[in-house]
C-alpha cells in the first residue's frame, strides 16, 4: 500500500514539472461503425471482388444477424460444393481405416520387395562359384591367347629377319611391310586349317550317325 502511494506521488511530481503549455496524451476515440450492414456497389469498379461474393455476405450476417438481410440458407454450400469439400477432406484428411489400409498395402509392398531382393541375392550367391570358375577360365584363355600371339609375332619377326638379314632394323618400313605380309599369310593359313577341322568334324559326325543307323544308309532310294 505504501509503495503504491509513493508511486502515485512520483507520477504527480513528474506531471507538476511539465511546462505550462503541455498536456497529457489523449487517444483518439475509436471510429464509429455504421449501425447497419454496408453493401458495396457492384457497379463500382473500385469495389473489391471478394465483397461481391458469399464470403462478404457471411461476414455481414455474422456481425448483424437478421438485420443484415441475408437469408441463412444461402450461406450453406451447394451440393456440388459439398462434394468438392468432401473429396478434398478425403484426400487431405483420410479416415483411420483408410490410413490403416494404406499402411498395410505399403508394408506388403515393402515385404515383397525385400523377399525378391533376398531371393535375387541367394540366386547370385548360388551362381558365384561357377562364375568364379568361368572368370578364371576366361583369364587363363586370355593369357594363353596373349602368349600365343606373342610367340607367333616373335616367330614371324625371326622369319622376317632370316629373309631380310639380321642387319636390317626391325623398325624400318621394309621390315614392317614384310612382317605384315607374313602375318596376313599366317592368318590365311589358320583360317584354312579351321575350316578344314570343321569339315572333318562334320564328316566324322555324319559317319557316326550312319554307323548308328545302318538300315537308313542301306535303304534303296526311290
From Swiss-Prot:
Q: Which domain of life is it from?
A: Eukaryota
Q: Which residues cross the membrane?
A: none
**Disulphide bonds in the chain:** none
On subunit structure and binding partners, the annotation says: Component of the mitochondrial large ribosomal subunit (mt-LSU). Mature mammalian 55S mitochondrial ribosomes consist of a small (28S) and a large (39S) subunit. The 28S small subunit contains a 12S ribosomal RNA (12S mt-rRNA) and 30 different proteins. The 39S large subunit contains a 16S rRNA (16S mt-rRNA), a copy of mitochondrial valine transfer RNA (mt-tRNA(Val)), which plays an integral structural role, and 52 different proteins. Interacts with GADD45A, GADD45B and GADD45G. Interacts with NR4A1 via the NR4A1 AB domain. Interacts with ATAD3A and ATAD3B. (Microbial infection) Interacts with the human papilloma virus type 16 (HPV 16) minor capsid protein L2.
The alphabetized list of GO BP terms reads: mitochondrial translation
Annotated tissue distribution? Widely expressed. Highly expressed in the thyroid gland, heart, lymph nodes, trachea and adrenal tissues. Expressed at lower level in liver skeletal muscle, kidney, pancreas, testis, ovary and stomach. Barely detectable in adrenal adenoma and papillary thyroid cancer.
What factors induce this protein?
Down-regulated by p53/TP53 in apoptotic cells.
Q: Which gene encodes it?
A: GADD45GIP1
Q: Which organism is it from?
A: Homo sapiens (Human)
> Would the keyword Heme be found if you checked this record's keyword annotation?
no
UniProt protein name: Large ribosomal subunit protein mL64
| Composition bias type Low complexity, residue spans | 203-212
Q: Name one GO cellular component term.
A: nucleoplasm
Coiled coil ranges (UniProt) are: 99-212
Q: Which Pfam families match?
A: CR6_interact
What are the entry keywords?
A: Cell cycle, Coiled coil, Host-virus interaction, Mitochondrion, Nucleus, Ribonucleoprotein, Ribosomal protein
Residues of the region (Disordered) are: 19-46, 188-222
Q: Which InterPro entries match?
A: Ribosomal_mL64, Ribosomal_mL64_sf
In the record, the note on similarity to other proteins reads: Belongs to the mitochondrion-specific ribosomal protein mL64 family.
The entry's other comment says: Cells overexpressing GADD45GIP1 were more likely to be in G1 and less likely to be in S phase and grow more slowly than control cells. Inhibiting the expression of GADD45GIP1 promotes cell cycle progression.
- Compositionally biased tracts (Basic residues): 25-36
Record motif Nuclear localization signal, residues = 184-200
Q: What does this protein do?
A: Acts as a negative regulator of G1 to S cell cycle phase progression by inhibiting cyclin-dependent kinases. Inhibitory effects are additive with GADD45 proteins but also occur in the absence of GADD45 proteins. Acts as a repressor of the orphan nuclear receptor NR4A1 by inhibiting AB domain-mediated transcriptional activity. May be involved in the hormone-mediated regulation of NR4A1 transcriptional activity. May play a role in mitochondrial protein synthesis.
Chief location of this protein within or outside the cell:
mitochondrion
Its subcellular locations are: Mitochondrion; Nucleus
Amino acid at each position: 500500500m505504501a509503495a503504491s502511494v509513493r508511486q502515485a506521488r512520483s507520477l504527480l511530481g513528474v506531471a507538476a514539472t511539465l511546462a505550462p503549455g503541455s498536456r497529457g496524451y489523449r487517444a483518439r476515440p475509436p471510429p464509429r461503425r455504421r449501425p447497419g450492414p454496408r453493401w458495396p456497389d457492384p457497379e463500382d469498379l473500385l469495389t473489391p471482388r471478394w465483397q461481391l461474393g458469399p464470403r462478404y455476405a457471411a461476414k455481414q450476417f455474422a456481425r448483424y444477424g437478421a438485420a443484415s438481410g441475408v437469408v441463412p440458407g444461402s450461406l450453406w454450400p451447394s451440393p456440388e460444393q459439398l462434394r468438392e469439400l468432401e473429396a478434398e477432406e478425403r484426400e487431405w484428411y483420410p479416415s483411420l481405416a483408410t490410413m490403416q489400409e494404406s499402411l498395410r498395402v505399403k508394408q506388403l509392398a515393402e515385404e515383397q520387395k525385400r523377399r525378391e531382393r533376398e531371393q535375387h541375392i541367394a540366386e547370385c550367391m548360388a551362381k558365384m562359384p561357377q562364375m568364379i570358375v568361368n572368370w578364371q577360365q576366361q583369364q587363363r584363355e586370355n593369357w594363353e591367347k596373349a602368349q600365343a600371339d606373342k610367340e607367333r609375332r616373335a616367330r614371324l619377326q625371326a622369319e622376317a629377319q632370316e629373309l631380310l638379314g639380321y642387319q636390317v632394323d626391325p623398325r624400318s618400313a621394309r621390315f614392317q611391310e614384310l612382317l605384315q605380309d607374313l602375318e596376313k599369310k599366317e592368318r590365311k593359313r589358320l583360317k584354312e586349317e579351321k575350316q578344314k577341322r570343321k569339315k572333318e568334324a562334320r564328316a566324322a559326325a555324319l559317319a557316326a550317325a550312319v554307323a548308328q543307323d545302318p538300315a537308313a544308309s542301306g535303304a534303296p532310294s526311290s
